[in-house]
UniProtKB/Swiss-Prot annotation:
UniProt-annotated stretches for the region Disordered: 1-30
Gene3D superfamilies given in the database record: Leucine-rich Repeat Variant
InterPro entries reported in the protein's UniProt record: ARM-like, ARM-type_fold, Armadillo, BAF250/Osa, BAF250_C
Major location category of this protein: nucleus
One GO location term (cellular component): nucleus
Stated name of the protein: Armadillo repeat-containing protein LFR
PROSITE patterns: ARM_REPEAT (PS50176)
Organism from which the protein derives: Arabidopsis thaliana (Mouse-ear cress)
Gene designation: LFR
Matches recorded under SUPFAM superfamilies: ARM repeat
ARM repeat placement: 227-269, 323-362, 366-407
GO biological process, one term: regulation of nuclear division
PANTHER family for this protein: BRG-1 ASSOCIATED FACTOR 250 BAF250 (PTHR12656), TRITHORAX GROUP PROTEIN OSA (PTHR12656:SF5)
Length: 460
């Protein structure tokens, strides 16, 4: 206690002391205590928060510039220690909060060869990956279980059960010779039956899988940085890899699929599907039709988070007019699934479905015509508004979808059946009264809608 009090009094009497040193690598074990303290204070002053890559990482901004070539070579080396170091480093460098104060000197995706090196790690795993239903479980080694000496710890039990020669009655030399030759033949076949005895296929496979997942996580982090979006959206190998992972979502690792899906969602607003038929070098056989089918396939999956991401992805892809010809053939299938998502009692699924439908009907007339004829489409959109959805923007988009549907003359006869529901919402929901006023005007005030109104009212 006396020493502690003396230390406190000595620190207070010395006036204003420097900030405490950050934890990290020691500055030198051979230097004196005073020199170490001075070095720690100097390092703490030099490392201001604006110069750090993260709130608690002692990594300077210049680290990327000085080590970018080393990181790429480490990824390409294939050595476990080097690849692990590079992936861990990139994970730290690529993790960036929205309000982070740091500014990378160079966008990570623009480092020469870095994106290709990461994609190569994923391709190496996919080359040896087995479908989940074909993956072998833990196998019990049965090498030489019927032999007297096996090398697996059963020697004493086996030797104790051996009968001495001549104990059998009526045994002949020919039978003994036959048994001896049979034993030799069986022992020579042990090594052929025990595949993978002297290599570590399963362990190596799991290491490759972990590296591929880590690489996909780094690429996902890259896609969140605006400086990297253009480079990645125009990188054919990157798009082919992530779309192929999405296409194989039934058999591929779930985390790898999730990272690929989030990556492609972040890049979708800049993506042109015609890149798959361009003259750029191709690494995976995938075209525009297969890419859209992969997204629709994951939209129909049983994982709700994947459904939401796929819906958002389709809504962003359709904004580009060049992508419409590849999405239009699958519009009926997409509509049906999005309407199913509206019926799920989950606010995120409903929001994703409404957002995708809003973009589809905004840019494509064929979408407006087909959506109005879909069963339960209007009912579930009205339910989102009546409930209401906790996010007002979702309710507003649902009302805008109905307004877009009624703008097509072919849809007015179908929508007249909901005239009473529209009138109720006109007086109940003040926020969306303008939209429903325009909807009722389109249904009843147009000169060509008199016959349609009679059909809606009298059921003609």
């Amino acid at each position: 206690m006396q020493k502690r009090e003396l230390g406190k009094s000595g620190g207070n009497s010395g006036g204003s002391s420097g900030p405490p040193a950050k934890r990290g690598r020691p500055f030198g074990s051979t230097s004196a205590n005073s020199a170490a303290a001075a070095a720690a204070a100097a390092a703490a002053d030099a490392m201001s928060p604006s110069a750090l890559l993260g709130p608690s990482l002692l990594v300077h901004n210049s680290f990327v510039e000085q080590n970018n070539r080393r990181i790429v070579l480490a990824l390409q080396s294939g050595l476990k220690s080097e690849v692990t170091w590079a992936l861990n480093t990139l994970t730290l460098l690529s993790f960036k909060e929205k309000e982070d104060i740091r500014r990378d000197v160079m966008p990570l995706a623009k480092i020469a060869g870095l994106l290709d090196a990461l994609l190569l790690i994923i391709d190496d795993w996919r080359d040896i990956a087995l479908p989940k239903d074909l993956t072998r479980g833990t196998r019990v080694r049965t090498l030489g279980t019927n032999a007297s000496v096996t090398g697996f710890g059963n020697e004493y039990d086996a030797l104790a059960s051996i009968q001495p020669p001549g104990s059998g009655i009526g045994s002949s030399a020919a039978e003994a010779l036959g048994k001896k030759s049979t034993g030799k033949h069986q022992s020579s076949q042990w090594w052929m039956e025990e595949d993978g005895l002297f290599n570590l296929d399963d362990e190596g496979r799991s290491e490759k899988q972990m590296c591929a997942i880590a690489a996909s996580n780094v690429i996902r982090n890259f896609s969140f940085m605006p400086d990297n979006e253009v480079v990645m959206a125009q990188h054919r190998h990157c798009l082919e890899t992530v779309f192929q992972c999405i296409h194989d979502h039934m058999t591929e690792d779930e985390e790898l699929v999730t990272n690929s899906l989030e990556t492609i969602v972040n890049l979708a607003h800049l993506m042109d599907l015609r890149i798959f038929s361009s003259l750029k070098q191709s690494y995976i056989n995938i075209n525009e039709k297969k890419a859209v089918q992969a997204v629709v396939g994951i939209l129909n999956s049983s994982v709700k988070a994947w459904n939401c991401a796929a819906a958002e992805l389709l809504g962003r892809l359709i904004i580009n007019p060049d992508n419409e010809p590849f999405i239009s053939p699958l519009i009926p299938q997409i509509h049906k699934r999005l309407i199913d998502l509206l019926s799920i009692q989950a606010v995120d699924a409903q929001a994703a479905a409404v957002g995708a439908l809003y973009n589809l009907v905004e840019v494509n007339m064929d979408c407006r015509l087909k959506l109005a004829s879909e069963r339960w489409a209007v009912d579930r959109l009205l339910k989102v508004i009546k409930t209401p959805h906790p996010v007002p923007e979702v309710c507003r988009k649902a009302a805008m979808i109905l307004e877009n549907l009624v703008s097509e003359p072919q849809n007015r006869g179908l929508l007249l059946a909901y005239e009473n529901a529209f009138a109720e919402l006109l007086f109940q929901e003040g926020k969306y009264s303008d939209s429903f006023a325009r909807i009722l005007y389109e249904l009843t005030a147009r000169s060509n809608s008199r016959v349609a109104s009679a059909r809606g009212i009298w059921g003609m």
